[in-house]
Regions:
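Metal-dependent polysaccharide deacetylase catalytic core of the NodB/CE4 family, i.e.
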Residues: 79-162, 224, 229-231
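Histidine-centered beta-alpha loop that forms part of the nucleotide-sugar donor binding/catalytic region
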Residues: 38, 121, 182-184
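Active-site-adjacent pocket scaffolds in enzyme catalytic domains
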Residues: 20-21, 156-231
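Short catalytic/ligand-binding loop motif for oxyanion handling, primarily in non-cytosolic enzymes
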Residues: 43-45, 91-94, 124-128, 163-168, ...
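Active-site beta->alpha N-cap acidic-glycine motif
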Residues: 15-106
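Bacterial N-terminal signal peptides
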Residues: 1-7
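Extracytoplasmic/secreted proteins, especially bacterial periplasmic and envelope-associated proteins
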Residues: 64-68, 135, 139, 143, ...
Length: 231
């Protein structure tokens, strides 16, 4: 389990849960801190059968661990929502820890209004053909929709790095218009990196996922969110 935190101090305590407010937030004039929890079976999972690191993380992923993190977040941010991202393996793993986590996350979606989505493991665009990345994103979205039920559908993808073609596919084929698709500060470390990009949200160009669109002719209607943004 990997949690991406910015600006929060989490304390274990009984959560104080207010009624979930599902009204859309106004972007203009506001600032936001996002918290995402990634559920995976190994580091740097690119696909079911493409894993860049062999370590099995099942013992790191427990119901007790994710519950403590979610409840600490609720205690300190009673109206806050967060995003859960599952790798394909984490969506399908039949072991007890992952089954319990999936069931709990479905409860959190109903209780808090959390986003539940696909996390294709940081580096899919570097190790898989773009068509396969697109196909597996659609497959994962369908799995998640069935898992959560009640017509639920993810509104974002937690990508790590996704190509411009992948972002265009999300916008045009899946009607998803937000993706974490770049880590601007990461270059030539871990299992891959990028060439740099703006460190704040932007609409990408069809030419490259790190390039902001220059006009209508190269505009992709999927906001590219940097994963490691810092002021």
């Amino acid at each position: 389990m990997v949690a991406v935190l910015s600006g929060f101090q989490l304390r274990a305590a009984d959560p104080v849960v207010a009624p979930v407010n599902m009204e859309p937030l106004t972007i203009e004039g506001n600032r936001f801190v996002t918290l995402c929890i990634m559920i995976r079976t190994t580091p740097w999972e690119v696909s079911r059968d493409v894993k860049l690191h062999p370590r099995d993380e099942v013992d790191w992923h427990t119901l007790e661990g994710v519950r403590a993190l979610r409840e600490a977040f609720a205690t300190n941010n009673p109206n806050g929502r967060l995003t859960w991202g599952f790798t394909m393996n984490a969506l399908e793993d039949g072991r007890k820890n992952y089954r319990e986590i999936r069931d709990y996350v479905v409860e959190c979606q109903k209780k808090y209004g959390d986003e539940v989505t696909y996390f294709p493991g940081y580096f899919p665009a570097m190790y898989l053909p773009r068509e396969r990345v697109n196909r597996e994103m659609s497959e994962a979205i369908e799995i998640i929709s069935k898992m959560v039920g009640n017509g639920y559908r993810p509104q974002s993808i937690m990508g790590g790095f996704l190509s411009a073609d992948n972002l265009r596919y999300l916008a045009e084929k899946e009607n998803i218009h937000v993706a974490h698709a770049v880590i601007w500060s990461q270059h030539n470390i871990d299992g891959g990196g990028a060439d740099g990009s703006p460190s704040y949200p932007f609409y990408p160009s069809t030419e490259h996922f790190c390039k902001p669109a220059q006009g209508k002719s190269d505009f992709i209607d999927c906001v590219n969110l940097d994963g490691w943004t810092m002021d």
